[in-house]
């Protein structure tokens, strides 16, 4: 970076010297003689000295800016424009205002008024030009940035010499924070109560959450049961009150015997309704009509009792008939289930085609299959080679199955090969039979051939 900046500064100096020579020649040719006379050699020397000092100050300011700036491309592009503008401003200022203070900075070329070039390029104020806002931790004096260290190569340390007290204070503050913490920002975690009574064994630990849930569930169930019981007790009390009121009214009207019978019947009906199913209770409730004030005559009481008895008998009959019909239907269903075979129905017309049969027996297969049959074991299929028959049977009992089409073809081959097997005696008998048949055929052919030759010889002799 230093070599680049030096080369650029040399190029700028050359340009400036060229521009000075041109400006002097132009002044000599185009400027008026009055102006030439006013400018003396001493003033020229002063201007040269001022220019030299301004150049040195500009270089130092540029270097400090380059250290602060993050994006390199923008800096490299904007630096020549700045240098050119500063050089032109130097010329204009040197030509126009010779009496200027040495420390005053030269003004740049006037730009378009709405152009915010300088505002955007002021890197110390703009956080988006590589410099973070002043309050952030990036500009912390205790944390010098990597780029400033890298570019300065030790020269950036002079920035923090004045702030050494602040840096030390910040360091001490960090140490305190690390030791004590910040309770205002991050509170301490709650201390766990030490339980010495519980001794945990490996694999026997059950989380406390599950126990809590179970306890909650039990508590809820007990609450629900208690609520249900309270509701039932309330209902019973209300029914008893109604029955007592009805019995008292009937006792006032009717005789003592009739009142006792009505109260007993009402209590019996309540017990029956509680024992019976829900739908019977509903029917009984539906049958009951809204209570009206009974007349003083005993005839109406007797009629109402008779009606109640009839309705009870009808309800009992309907219940019995429904239960009998349900039991009959259940018996029918069980009988039908017993008659039908459980499981998938067999395919109708599952005749075997030529595709289902394999090829003929290979040499040695017949003998092997005969040995399996003699031992009473199942014959393995070609897809099961490498496994013993016991292993295959175990696999099939567990549930391992071949693919359907392969299974069908293998079964067909197995059946055909089992049918092809013969015992040793049968083989001998077959061999003898085939030999006899062959000899008969051969003898027949030979006799026919002999007869033909004999007939031909006799025909020649006759001639």
Swiss-Prot record:
Localization in the cell: Nucleus
Skewed-composition ranges (Basic and acidic residues): 15-29, 39-71, 107-125, 279-288, 330-340
Pfam families referenced in this protein's UniProt entry, alphabetically: Nkap_C
Single annotated GO MF: chromatin binding
Sequence ranges of Basic residues compositional bias: 1-14, 208-238, 289-312
Annotated positions of the Phosphoserine modification: 136, 189, 191
Residues modified as Phosphothreonine: 195
GO BP of this protein: mRNA splicing, via spliceosome; regulation of gene expression
Predominant subcellular localization, coarse grouping: nucleus
InterPro entries: NKAP (IPR040466), NKAP_C (IPR009269)
GO cellular component: catalytic step 2 spliceosome; nucleus
Phenotype on disruption: Late embryonic to early larval lethal. RNAi-mediated knockdown in the wing imaginal discs causes a developmental delay of 1 to 2 days and results in viable adults with small crumpled wings possessing extra vein tissue. Larval imaginal discs show tissue overgrowth with loss of tissue architecture and formation of multilayered epithelia, characteristics of tumorigenesis; cells show increased invasiveness, loss of polarity, increased levels of R-loop-associated genome instability and increased levels of c-Jun N-terminal kinase-induced apoptosis.
Annotated stretches, region: Disordered: 1-358
Bias-annotated ranges (Low complexity): 78-98, 241-267
Entry keyword Phosphoprotein: yes
Keywords: Nucleus, Phosphoprotein, Tumor suppressor
Biological function: Tumor suppressor involved in maintaining genome integrity. Influences gene expression and mRNA splicing.
PANTHER family membership: NF-KAPPA B ACTIVATING PROTEIN, NFKB ACTIVATING PROTEIN LIKE
Protein name: NF-kappa-B-activating protein
Annotated organism of origin: Drosophila melanogaster
């Amino acid at each position: 970076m230093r070599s680049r900046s030096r080369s650029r500064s040399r190029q700028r100096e050359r340009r400036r010297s060229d521009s000075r020579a041109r400006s002097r020649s132009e002044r000599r040719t185009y400027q008026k003689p009055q102006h030439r006379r006013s400018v003396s050699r001493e003033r020229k020397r002063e201007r040269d000295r001022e220019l030299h000092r301004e150049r040195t100050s500009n270089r130092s300011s540029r270097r400090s800016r380059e250290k602060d700036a993050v994006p390199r491309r923008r800096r490299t592009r904007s630096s020549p424009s700045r240098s050119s503008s500063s050089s032109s401003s130097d010329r204009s200022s040197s030509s126009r205002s010779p009496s200027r203070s040495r420390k005053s900075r030269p003004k740049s070329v006037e730009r378009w008024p709405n152009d915010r070039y300088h505002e955007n390029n002021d890197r110390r104020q703009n956080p988006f030009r590589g410099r973070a806002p002043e309050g952030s931790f990036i500009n912390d004096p205790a944390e010098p940035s990597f780029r400033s260290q890298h570019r300065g190569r030790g020269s950036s340390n002079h920035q923090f010499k004045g702030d050494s007290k602040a840096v030390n204070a910040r360091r001490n503050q960090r140490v305190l924070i690390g030791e004590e913490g910040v309770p205002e920002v991050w509170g301490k975690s709650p201390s766990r109560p030490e339980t010495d009574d519980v001794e945990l064994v490996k694999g026997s630990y059950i989380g406390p959450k599950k126990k809590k849930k179970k306890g909650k569930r039990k508590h809820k169930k007990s609450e629900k049961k208690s609520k249900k019981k309270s509701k039932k007790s309330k209902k019973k009390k209300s029914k008893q009150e109604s029955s007592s009121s009805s019995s008292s009214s009937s006792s006032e009207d009717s005789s003592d015997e009739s009142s006792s019978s009505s109260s007993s019947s009402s209590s019996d009906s309540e017990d029956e309704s509680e024992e019976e199913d829900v739908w019977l209770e509903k029917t009984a409730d539906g049958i009951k009509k809204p209570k009206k004030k009974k007349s003083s005559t005993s005839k109406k009481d007797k009629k109402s009792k008779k009606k109640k008895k009839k309705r009870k008998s009808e309800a009992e009959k309907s219940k019995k008939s429904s239960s009998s019909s349900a039991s009959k239907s259940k018996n029918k269903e069980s009988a039908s289930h017993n008659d039908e075979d459980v499981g998938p129905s067999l395919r109708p017309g599952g005749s075997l085609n030529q595709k289902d049969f394999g090829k003929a027996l290979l040499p040695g297969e017949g003998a092997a299959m005969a040995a399996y049959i003699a031992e009473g074991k199942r014959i393995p299929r070609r897809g099961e080679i490498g496994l013993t028959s016991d292993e295959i049977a175990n696999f099939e009992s567990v549930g391992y199955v071949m693919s359907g089409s392969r299974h069908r073809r293998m079964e067909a081959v197995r059946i055909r090969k089992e049918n092809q097997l013969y015992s040793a005696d049968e083989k001998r008998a077959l061999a003898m039979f085939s030999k006899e048949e062959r000899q008969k055929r051969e003898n027949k052919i030979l006799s026919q051939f002999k007869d033909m030759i004999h007939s031909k010889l006799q025909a020649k002799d006759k001639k």
